[in-house]
Amino acid sequence: MSQKIYFKILRFDKTHNDHVYLPGENSVENFQTEGSCVPGRLYFCDPSDPKQNICRYLHYGDVLVDITLPTNDPDFKMIVDPSGTKCCANKIIIGTERELSDPETFAYMASHGVDIHKNYIIHWAFKNFHDRVLFYLLKTNLNENRLRIVEHIFKNPSSLISNRNYNFYIVNFLQRFKKHLNSLTDNQYSDIITNLINLSNKIIEKYFEDMTGNKNFGLDIPEKDWCSYIIENDLDKGSISKILDWSFKNNKKMIIEYVISLFIEDYHYLEKIFSLSCKYHDSRIAEILIKKSINKERCLISACEAGFLEIVECLVKQDVNINLLKGTPLVTACQFGHLLIVDFLVNNSADIHIRDNAPILYACRYGHVDIVDYLIGKGIDIHTVSSQALINACNRGHLNVMELLVEKGADIRSVENILVVEACRNTNADILRFLVRIGVDVLSKGVEPLIVACERGQLAIVQYLIDIGIDICANDNEALIKSCRSGFANIVNLLIENGADVKARDNEALIIACEKCNHTIVTILVSNGADITARNNEALIRACHNEAVGKYFIDFLIEKGADVHARNDIVFDFIHKLFAGNIPKSLKFPFSKNQSDSKLIH
């Protein structure tokens, strides 16, 4: 038997092309001596022949095995494949095997003459997530070219990965590889390595968000791999929380319980996990955590927020004080609209009047009309809460709550001014119509409702106010001026169509529009008679004082009739600065500084 060592790559199951390889002697019948890469041969590589680099075949398997040849056997046959890249025989002897994920395997190859510094090996190591091998390959032959190859891969990692679930393994691989890179920063390639670390962080962030943000991602990844990922990569609590959220979505109990074991002494974080268990209505995990030494009052609030009645009942049975923390459990249930929990808490002595009737005020603010009705039925005095309750409902646009409050006797008179203005502010023409329908005199509130609607760009409300007869020219056309300042061209147009005076306050609306450099509004105003030269050319001067103004806006104003000769020095200085002294003939600036005659500046 020959003592020379040859190499072969095999999978963990030791199969290839329907042939099962066993330790010791392996053979084939009908050995083929003709052709290249044909069945009926046992292939292997000679490490002493550079053309037969075993690393070409890394993608064929998981382990490297030593091959020796039974040269003393009279039936033994061997040839070099016509491709020249491998040998083949009818009989081989398989010896020691070494895993390709181990850097020592590559050191062993190199000791037998294999060139392990081929660039394609770097790609293979990345694609198979062998971080220790990749680091070994770089460290043993560190140069800029090889680092640039890694950099290129990092910039487009998906080019090597076809399976979307591999995102998990990419992130895991990069977390580990980044630790290796940190040990290389003190050398002549430190800038490149630092960039690789930064690229790693970006890829990790991107893929991690994709992993944890997609409910269907990674369902076939073993839970033990997720657990290993958490402990091996020193993840912060924010990242762990994202994994937990994904785990609850997909009912991955092993991961959740593993994280609980990691934070068994961190009661604050256990409360966070409890909140997630409530969010996903996972009673088993919630009950596990309740048995820990966590704050049960805060847990009750989490259960109320999530609408998890089963756990609310469980905690109340354990004599948790439902009126502690200023009655937050009931207030929370009212805020998030969980009527069944509100009913349960009230029937278990929760104080509906706590914190100056906060429960009903929160229900009004968040639009839960069924809870508002329930609390009134349980004894809330509508006259005590009516003002703030109406304001809360109006602020958020909850017309149905306002209708219920009025039906139950809420006094709207004391707050009708506030309600009118808030309805105009919050884009709710339906509430405004409701107020008019129940007798509120909107027109008696002055111009403020119109001003608020114009400032907020509420076109439908402005139209409604015009329809019911509001004076759009009040306060010397303040509504038009506010609309120009806020930049709502559609409202400017509507006001002008209904009689607003574009020249009010000596063309203030146009001057403000020029100050804001609003082409559309300036065009509307000028086309409706605004004087662009008013106040000694103030519109152009205001535009010149706006640092964001563009060259073509100035030309636009001149085309509209702005007088460039008025206040010559101010306009010249601005235009000269804007064009860096090189004013093109295509723009119409027919003057120069300190000259009264018209000369084009070149």
Swiss-Prot record:
Write down the InterPro entries for this protein, in alphabetical order. Ankyrin_rpt, Ankyrin_rpt-contain_sf
Instruction: Report each ANK repeat as a residue range.
Output: 133-162, 269-294, 295-324, 325-354, 355-384, 386-414, 416-444, 445-474, 476-504, 506-534, 536-566
Q: Work out whether the entry's keyword set contains Magnesium.
A: no
Keyword list (alphabetical) reads: ANK repeat, Repeat
State the protein's name.
Putative ankyrin repeat protein L100
> Which species is this record about?
Acanthamoeba polyphaga mimivirus
